[in-house]
Swiss-Prot record:
Residues 42-62, 246-277 are annotated as: Disordered. SMART domains: HOX. This is Homeobox protein HB1. GO terms for cellular component: nucleus. Pfam families: Homeodomain (PF00046). It comes from Tripneustes gratilla. Transmembrane segments: none annotated. InterPro entries: Antp_homeobox, HD, HD_metazoa, Homeobox_CS, Homeodomain-like_sf, HTH_motif. GO terms for molecular function: DNA-binding transcription factor activity, RNA polymerase II-specific; RNA polymerase II cis-regulatory region sequence-specific DNA binding. Keywords: Developmental protein, DNA-binding, Homeobox, Nucleus. It comes from the Eukaryota. Residues 189-248 bind DNA. CDD domains: homeodomain (cd00086). A motif (Antp-type hexapeptide) lies at residues 172-177.
Length: 307
């Protein structure tokens, strides 16, 4: 193989209109009529194993290009056929370079990127990242927007990893939940537990002692007097009524428990006495609980005394 690069667009396999197609033996290559004069359209082939003589052929100006010396099937040779973009494998072309040493796509891409973008700007950015001025500008920007910025790692090789916390946007709505470091704290409209002073508690207890249920007018008067809202006074009275109900219920349960215990002890004492008397054979007559005297009995008693 002589190493001649054959380009299919210049040398198609099938002939164009008006061309003659000749079958070539194995081991040879086809050349279109582009390499010859248009008056004599004829395809020829050259063998890859023969030595290259010299032959000059006329052709169209657009098709005259150098392919190197080649021997044609039919007895002629072609030399000084120059190409601008295609050359020998061993030679270096201006358009595509050496074919024996393929160009890496990565290097080609890097070269194009270097030509497209200014490398000095990247260098200045790297210098800024190294000296910390970039961090200062980011912090200043974060302070203006209300974001919290924390450096996760030191800038290295033009890469700076920053962890941005959720910003509190100025266009937010009050009903939107607040996310970020304040989660779990009292944020927004969450109410705290109301604490009452000793004076307020004393006045409320005095009012509850006389009136367990308040009217609207009295509630308004207490709110102005104690500096509380009507809702706070209403809730306090509700809680106080529940507390009073619970205390009274516990007191009733305690009294009923004590009475049951006394009755049980009395009954057990009488039963023990009766069992002891029955064992000894003694019969005790119970004394009547009350003596009822009629009128006749009183008259009889008086006569007995006077006599």
């Amino acid at each position: 193989n002589s190493g001649v690069f054959v380009n299919p667009p210049f040398f198609p396999t099938y002939p164009h209109a008006g061309e003659q197609f000749y079958v070539t033996p194995p081991g040879s290559y086809e050349l279109s009529s582009c390499a010859f004069s248009s008056k004599n359209p004829k395809t020829s082939s050259y063998s890859s194993s023969s030595s290259p003589p010299s032959l000059t052929a006329t052709s169209k100006p657009s098709c005259t290009q150098q392919l190197g010396a080649a021997t044609f099937y039919g007895g002629g040779t072609l030399s000084n056929f120059s190409t601008a973009g295609y050359g020998d494998h061993s030679t270096t072309s201006a358009g595509y370079g050496s074919m024996s040493q393929p160009i890496s796509p990565t290097s080609a891409w890097d070269s194009r990127m270097a030509a497209t973008y200014n490398t000095t700007s990247w260098g200045s950015t790297a210098a800024e990242l190294g000296d910390g001025s970039y961090r200062g500008r980011v912090n200043a920007l974060a302070a203006g927007t209300g974001c919290l910025v924390s450096a996760a790692a030191e800038p290295n090789n033009n890469h700076c990893s920053q962890v941005m916390s959720p910003c509190k946007s100025t266009s937010g709505y009050p009903w939107m939940p607040v996310a970020g470091p304040n989660v779990g704290l009292e944020v927004g409209r969450k109410r705290c537990r109301q604490t009452y002073t000793r004076y307020q508690t004393l006045e409320l207890e005095k009012e509850f002692h006389f009136n367990r249920y308040l009217t609207r007018r009295r509630r308004i008067e207490l709110s102005h007097l104690l500096g509380l809202t009507e809702r706070q006074i209403k809730i306090w009275f509700q809680n106080r009524r529940m507390k009073y109900k619970k205390e009274s219920k516990n007191k009733e349960e305690g009294v009923s428990g004590e009475g049951d215990g006394e009755n049980e002890t009395e009954s057990t004492g009488t039963e023990n006495a009766q069992t002891q008397n029955a064992v000894h054979g003694v019969t005790i007559l119970e004394k009547p609980s009350s003596l009822v005297l009629h009128v006749d009995d009183t008259i009889a008693l008086n006569t007995v005394r006077h006599s």
